[in-house]
């Protein structure tokens, strides 16, 4: 939203609708280890150090005999970041991938995702030999004001088509706010 000041009067007029502003709703950082036990605990410690908050564990949805995974066994951990913490982590995470994303990383609903092969690529992260190196997925969700109506408890409703965040809106937000270069896949 632009703010224009008229010369001499000191009055400010706003251009643009504040309801149309796109904002970062949340960032999810996810590490999938594929097995429970010591490796999962190490991944939790790494995620705790990187995000600054305690991660939760996720269980396997079904049994996969080829990989030795049983249904209900904890195999992954994730942290959901919101607000300023999400903005700060996303800036650091994008530096790990050279501030560039593919257009295919954005979906039609204003979400984006990218992978980081080694957590030590994130600026400010040090290698700890006892923990090892983990890769992670970073997923972001973009929203506009008014998206609460689909999550509220009483009389939830749908977001209208004109108000939804599209792929183009998401690309424009990421290039403008975070300086991301979007490559055509």
Over which residues does each language-model region extend?
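Ribosome-associated RNA-binding proteins
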Residues: 1-185
């Amino acid at each position: 939203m632009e703010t224009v000041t008229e010369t001499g009067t000191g009055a400010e007029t706003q251009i643009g609708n504040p309801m149309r502003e796109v904002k970062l709703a949340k960032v999810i950082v996810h590490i999938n280890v594929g097995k429970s036990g010591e490796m999962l605990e190490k991944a939790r410690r790494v995620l705790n150090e990187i995000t600054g908050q305690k991660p939760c564990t996720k269980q396997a949805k079904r049994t996969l005999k080829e990989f030795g995974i049983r249904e209900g066994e904890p195999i992954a951990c994730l942290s959901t970041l919101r607000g300023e913490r999400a903005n700060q982590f996303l800036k650091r995470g994008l530096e790990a991938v050279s501030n560039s994303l593919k257009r295919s990383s954005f979906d039609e609903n204003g979400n984006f995702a990218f992978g980081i092969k080694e957590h030590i690529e994130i600026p400010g992260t040090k290698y700890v030999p006892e923990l090892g190196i983990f890769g992670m997925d970073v997923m972001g969700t973009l929203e506009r004001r008014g998206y609460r109506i689909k999550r509220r408890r009483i009389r939830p409703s749908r977001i209208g088509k004109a108000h939804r965040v599209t792929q183009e809106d998401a690309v424009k937000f990421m290039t403008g706010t975070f300086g991301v270069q979007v490559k055509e896949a």
